[in-house]
Amino acid sequence: MLRQNRGAGAIAADVMTGVRPEAETGNSVPTAIAVTSADLVLPPTDQQTPTAALLQAPDVQALEMAIGDMHVLLEQHGYVVAVYPTGISPAHERRLYSVRSVLESDRIALVKVDLPPLGVAVLVRQLRQLSICDFSPGVVASAARLLTHYIHAGALLHSVTKFDRVPVDLRTHAKSWVPGSQFAVVAGPEPQLVRVGPKADPPTGPEFATHLMTAKGQSQSEWVKETLAPAWQVQSIHESALPSESPAWWGTGKLVEFAAYLPDISVLYQLVSSVRRENCRWCRMELIGDRCGFCSSPLPAAEHRMHTAGVLSHEALAPPQS
């Protein structure tokens, strides 16, 4: 580890002039995945899935220490993909950019994700799984945007009076004042909001087989497990602690957050592999999709080709027949 009395300038000089780590000399070292909150790190799915590094907020860690921690990650892994939600504080987001600026490193990707907190945690774990595959750091970073389209993230809410992430009409707002009212909201990939009731259909779910992650707040409702999960034909249900940012994100603490996702690393690998790879014209990093995960430079439209059709289906993830 770095000694605490080393200045930020000395650390930055090490990054710019020092010998690059094993990840860039031919040996296999996973790309580091980093997060801005510890509760975005779900338990690993297997013994091979690495954990994620924590990039702490400015009110918790001094800038020089944050620079030192990032320098260690770069030394150990070569590249860092930092994933953070849209809901973090402006000061925390500025800290991420400050650290990258001081280090003057082109090996740090800052990936901002517009998903609810539990959805972000699910995405982070998928990236952790992919980090040990034979994908370049650029592909891992740009895979985040691809995978968000395959995470159906939402919540069961007891009120939508303070919820502003999905358009809510006045009639629905009025109904939320009725005692016992509950609403099922899907924030992405396609926004949906329905009032929960005996005759109401659940929101439209994924057209491929998934697992379902749930996290309870101050709600004891079993609707997600008893109604939504069967309707979405999920293969397995898992429970997690509610992320600390979830009540603020959803506008209420009386909720059950959920996220349907692809659990199988082989399917994730196939999905990412099915997309055409390009080299960023600006930083030369490898990428998939329409934007570089490291420098955010867009790919010219004529070069953006997706080839994911036919990769996913309920049958593709169905459990083997005994």
Pin down the residues of each PLM region.
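Domain-scale terminal segments
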Residues: 1-223
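Cys/His-clustered metal-coordination modules, chiefly Zn-binding fingers
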Residues: 214-322
